[in-house]
Amino acid sequence: CLARCSHPNIVKHVLSMDLDGMLLIVMEYADGGDLYKQIKARQPGMKYFKEHEILFIFLPLCLALDHIHGKRMMHRDLKTANVLLTCTGLVKLGDFGFSRQYEDSLSKPVGSTFCGTPYYLSPELWRRAPYSKKSEMWALGGVLYEVMALKRPFGGKNMDELIDNI
């Protein structure tokens, strides 16, 4: 899916090749790390992002998702670790390993594979319902919450507690 995307807020696909049965993908390098690490670095002193900083992070992410949705694709693993940053402050959506093309109707499910990162999965995914655009929006809301609060919206001592909290 990444090869079909060309947007300033999506990591660029440079090259794909098969090397002895292994798929190698070369992508643009985001030299500023990822959003998860930026959040972790702010946690000790609770150095919250200012409102304009949140906007500069969240708006490009929304534009990237709008672009891939416009191409009838879904990311399916939206999380702060997959929001990459450049040293100049650009936000880039990366890691399209779980992304899938969807049918003409957004109401239809997208793939039958259970995938994603537990903290960002919507309640219906935990009930093993198929992935849909609603699930993608749930994860987007989780990312926004994490940027604003410097912590994930849901947690737990173990997976069962996390699922109950979601």
Q: Which residue stretches match the model-derived regions?
A:
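Conserved catalytic-loop aspartate of Hanks-type protein kinases
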Residues: 136
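AlphaC helix of the protein kinase catalytic domain
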Residues: 36-48
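Activation segment signature within eukaryotic-like protein kinase domains
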Residues: 57-58
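A conserved loop-to-beta-strand element in the N-lobe of protein kinase catalytic cores
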Residues: 20-28, 36-37
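Protein kinase catalytic-loop region centered on the HRD/HxD motif
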Residues: 63-73
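A short, aromatic-enriched beta-strand patch in the conserved N-lobe beta-sheet
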Residues: 15-16
